[in-house]
């Protein structure tokens, strides 16, 4: 299980990302529409003004049950070893083990 402080930090980043999403998107759109380089640099400065944790690349998907940030399957929201355990226990409908 991940530390609660890490899970809380991730939730805080998600809130920040949602808060500054429109500002980032509008600034990027302005940069693509303006031809002059000097104005692009000014808008780029505005793009750097939001907090660093509000960037979408700072977010991690975490396992629903353990909070593990790596080896997550998007379809299930689970990490690999938890997914394997649940499939073996027949807790995920429609998921089967491969055999050939």
Curated annotation (Swiss-Prot):
Gene3D superfamilies: 1.10.287.1480
This protein's GO CC annotations: chloroplast; small ribosomal subunit
Record has Plastid as a keyword: yes
Pfam families listed in its UniProt record: Ribosomal_S14
Domain of life per record: Eukaryota
Keywords, ordered alphabetically: Chloroplast, Plastid, Ribonucleoprotein, Ribosomal protein, RNA-binding, rRNA-binding
Keyword Signal on entry: no
One MF annotation (Gene Ontology) recorded for this entry: structural constituent of ribosome
GO biological process: translation
Ranges in a coiled coil: none
Localization of this protein: Plastid, Chloroplast
Similarity field: Belongs to the universal ribosomal protein uS14 family.
Function: Binds 16S rRNA, required for the assembly of 30S particles.
Binding partners and assembly: Part of the 30S ribosomal subunit.
Protein name per UniProt: Small ribosomal subunit protein uS14c
Provenance organism: Draba nemorosa
Higher taxonomy: Eukaryota, Viridiplantae, Streptophyta, Embryophyta, Tracheophyta
Gene: rps14
């Amino acid at each position: 299980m991940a530390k609660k402080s890490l899970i809380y930090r991730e939730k805080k980043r998600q809130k920040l990302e949602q808060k500054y999403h429109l500002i980032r998107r509008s600034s990027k759109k302005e940069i693509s529409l303006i031809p002059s380089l000097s104005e692009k640099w000014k808008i780029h400065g505005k793009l750097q003004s939001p907090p660093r944790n509000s960037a979408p690349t700072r977010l991690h998907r975490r396992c629903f049950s353990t909070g593990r940030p790596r080896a997550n399957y998007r379809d299930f929201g689970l990490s690999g070893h938890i997914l394997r355990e649940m499939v073996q226990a027949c807790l995920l409908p429609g998921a089967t083990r491969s055999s050939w």
